[in-house]
């Protein structure tokens, strides 16, 4: 039985265009004639079982998480130029030597916590260090430590040169999490991300509902 992911105010731009007219409440278009929909329902072949990023490695969970969270590096499936991996929350990076990588971060990113808490190098260090204590440790093979250089720059040390390390940073379970949310004792802090949608409700075995982030830092999505 297929499980449902419900995205209020739509979900992904491509999917929204492809399934326009399917499901949800009607709303009049700007010209007052043709209604459009505010809800997109997506079926998945497997049940969602865990939304704690670093304690799961399930593709069904990642369908949700890649809408609510974002990674340092963006995996390009070929639709956005020739580069296989491009900037995500990191604008650029370079190997200083075989074992040290400097990453510069976007300065306009906020967590979807309702407080517009900025995403900084402290959050990146926190996320990567935490990963080494969880089941996704293998996804960060070779990681030694991170050093915050300034608010929006971080240095990552790896054990030996590995040209695939940057690729590992595009893994959904390594999406950047809010250090402040954990420090403040927020309930289920792993649900707070930087993506265009935020967690609303999950009924296990039935559906998971996300809502659009009204003050999303990136390009406005449908």
Regions found by a protein language model. Name each.
Residues 1-40, 53:
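Short, low-complexity disordered leader/linker segments with a strong preference
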Residues 35-36, 48-55, 80-83, 112, ...:
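Short, solvent-exposed loop/turn elements at domain surfaces
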Residues 36-46, 100-104, 124-127, 154-156, ...:
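Short, well-ordered beta-strand elements
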Residues 91-135, 155:
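Aromatic- and charge-enriched surface segment that lines or borders ligand/interaction sites
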Residues 76-80, 169-222:
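Gly/Pro-rich hinge or "lid" segments in bacterial periplasmic/extracellular proteins
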Residues 27-41, 98-99, 117, 193, ...:
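Immediate post-signal peptide segment of exported/extracytoplasmic ligand-binding proteins
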Residues 94, 102, 136-180, 198-203:
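Surface-exposed binding/hinge segments that line
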Residues 43-96, 192:
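N-terminal lobe/hinge region of extracytoplasmic solute-binding protein
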């Amino acid at each position: 039985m297929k499980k449902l992911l419900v995205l209020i105010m739509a979900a992904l731009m491509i999917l929204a265009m492809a399934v326009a007219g399917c499901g949800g409440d009607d709303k009049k278009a700007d010209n007052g004639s043709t209604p459009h929909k505010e809800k997109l329902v997506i079926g998945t072949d497997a049940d969602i079982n865990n939304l704690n990023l670093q304690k799961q490695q399930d593709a069904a969970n990642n369908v949700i998480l890649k809408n609510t969270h974002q990674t340092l590096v963006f995996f390009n499936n070929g639709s956005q130029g020739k580069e296989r991996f491009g900037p995500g929350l990191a604008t650029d990076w370079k190997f200083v030597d075989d074992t040290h990588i400097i990453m510069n971060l976007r300065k306009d990113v906020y967590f979807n916590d309702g407080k517009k808490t900025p995403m900084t190098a402290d959050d990146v260090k926190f996320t990567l260090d935490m990963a080494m204590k969880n089941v996704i440790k293998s996804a960060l093979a070779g990681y030694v430590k991170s050093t915050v250089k300034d608010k929006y720059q971080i240095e990552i040390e790896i054990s030996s040169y590995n040209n695939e390390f940057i690729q590992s940073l595009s893994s959904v379970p390594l999406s950047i999490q809010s250090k402040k949310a954990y420090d403040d004792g927020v309930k289920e802090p792993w649900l707070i991300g930087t993506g265009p949608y935020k967690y609303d409700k999950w009924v296990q075995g039935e559906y998971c509902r996300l809502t659009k982030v009204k003050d999303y830092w990136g390009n406005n999505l449908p």
